[in-house]
């Protein structure tokens, strides 16, 4: 057992990844597991994090695809107030879920940003890699679900 990875982190990352990947059945499973282990506010916080990070991920991928530097610097101009209080989560948990969601959504800008923040706050490279592994496994399971 990895002491850095408690149930809240593992199930939260798995739930966030399933929501971001769109796998309906696996999302139901992880939501049920989260509700058994944690309170409703945790589930709502994960959902809020997925919503805001999906908005950010689409915007930053869109902006980074622009043909010139001026357009790549365009301001977002969308309210993301929920990030001020980390969607009701601990800062590190919020950043961890945000990294997981950004990996699922393929946003390089956000992956780099959240990784840097986690490293600056003492998280190890292995911690970062394991977040990517959780996201990868859940996305793979979601893809299999869509085949059936």
For the regions a protein language model found, what residue spans apply to each?
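Hydrophobic alpha-helical segments
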Residues: 1-148
